[in-house]
Amino acid sequence: MKAQPIRAAVRIIGIDPGLRRTGWGVIESEGNRLIYVGCGSVEPPDDLPLANRLLAIHEGLAKVLNDFQPLEAAVEQTFVNKDGVATLKLGQARGIAMLAPAMFGISVAEYAPNQVKKTVVGAGHADKGQIAVMLKILLPKAEPPSADAADALAIAITHAHHRQGQALRMKVAGL
């Protein structure tokens, strides 16, 4: 009988970037098992100038990264809406969300919002309520304080599923 390989848990942080509230969620993925670790959000004061809000987001994420020590990160891609200025500002928050883990030497994956919904719920156009229901099933101990924290957990789950699929494809290919 062949011994089963030991599967080490991988700690993953999901980040849902935003200027008002940047959600974060940390899980551990071990084989098919997902374990809730923590979640929350970084909320810079609205009255700060943009540069200072971006700094507050960076400092908040750096604290979370230092406290939870994830090995991998995933960030939601920005969707382009009709308000070009708002899209550009959100892109700046997303840049900070990608920079913070990179400064800790953590690789960062990116996922489109509909890819996150499809992975977690099974439908690319799922609503926040459907995501919340699936989070309760997949991570029963999680009680996200905001929709942004819930989205961040969904992003982390998406990364866990996609990295597992990638590892399986590499194993089948003999790499």
UniProtKB/Swiss-Prot annotation:
Described by its record, this protein's role is as follows: The RuvA-RuvB-RuvC complex processes Holliday junction (HJ) DNA during genetic recombination and DNA repair. Endonuclease that resolves HJ intermediates. Cleaves cruciform DNA by making single-stranded nicks across the HJ at symmetrical positions within the homologous arms, yielding a 5'-phosphate and a 3'-hydroxyl group; requires a central core of homology in the junction. The consensus cleavage sequence is 5'-(A/T)TT(C/G)-3'. Cleavage occurs on the 3'-side of the TT dinucleotide at the point of strand exchange.
Checking Pfam families in the record gives: RuvC
This chain belongs to the protein called Crossover junction endodeoxyribonuclease RuvC
InterPro entries the record matches: RNaseH-like_sf (IPR012337), RNaseH_sf (IPR036397), X-over_junc_endoDNase_Mg_BS (IPR020563), X-over_junc_endoDNase_RuvC (IPR002176)
Q: How does it assemble?
A: Homodimer which binds Holliday junction (HJ) DNA. The HJ becomes 2-fold symmetrical on binding to RuvC with unstacked arms; it has a different conformation from HJ DNA in complex with RuvA. In the full resolvosome a probable DNA-RuvA(4)-RuvB(12)-RuvC(2) complex forms which resolves the HJ.
GO terms in the biological process aspect are: DNA recombination; DNA repair
What the record notes about the co-factor is: Binds 2 Mg(2+) ion per subunit.
List the catalytic residues. D16, E76, D148
Q: What is the originating organism of this protein?
A: Bradyrhizobium sp. (strain BTAi1 / ATCC BAA-1182)
One function term, GO molecular function aspect: DNA binding
Give compartment(s). Answer: Cytoplasm
Positions with a binding annotation for Mg(2+) 2: E76
Q: List the cysteine pairs that form cystine.
A: none
May I have one GO cellular component term? Holliday junction resolvase complex
Q: What is its EC number?
A: 3.1.21.10
Predominant location: cytoplasm
